[in-house]
Amino acid sequence: MSQPKKSLSSLLAPYLTLDPAAERMIGAITTDNRQLDADTLWLAARGVSHHALDYYTPDLPAAAIAYEPPYANPPAGAIPCECLSEHLGDIAARFYDDPSQALDIIGVTGTDGKSSLVHFLAQATGGAMLGTIGYGTLDALEAASHTTPDPLRIQQHLAQYRDAGITTVAMEVSSHALAQHRVGGIRFRIGVFTNLSRDHLDYHHDMEDYFLAKARLFAQPLPVAVINIDDA
């Protein structure tokens, strides 16, 4: 999908003051060095075991590089942005003109029942869904790569749904996605909590950490919260 170009400063302004000499017009954003073009902003974040800049080579095309410090010997002209991995969703939302502001988004979290409930909600509302079953409307589902996609892809999907005239989106919000800030930049209309049982403790270490990750969905102001209090 084609987006109007945005100034680099408008995308990064909340996190840093950009040198006027570094201003650029940005036509695309990515976290993947294989998707770079001459008008692309490369958001080079730190991962679990590698930093995106580990894959930098001088011949990579990019309008600008924003990277998450610390990183030894970043490329000349690369812009340090503290906690970049936590801001990816917000940056993507600004690039795509805040699509969640035009949508009623229902976020569903919990150990069990997310996929079924999101599918039922998409059926009931005639809207789109994002989850394990797929991404899109029920008559045109795209295969899912993750329960909750990466933050840039989420915002791209939401912008597509907005531009197609869709008004409601039901999405699975996994504990991994919440812990990794993948749903940053999304204004949820409704938050739903299905249940909590032992799962993903290889990632969350204990039940308290797992619960706190799920609870992040409800940390933002929600017009409506639906919480299952009897899972018998």
Q: At which residue positions do the language-model features occur?
A:
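A short acidic, amphipathic alpha-helical/loop segment
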Residues: 54-58, 181-182, 232
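Helix N-cap/beta->alpha junction signal
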Residues: 69, 229-231
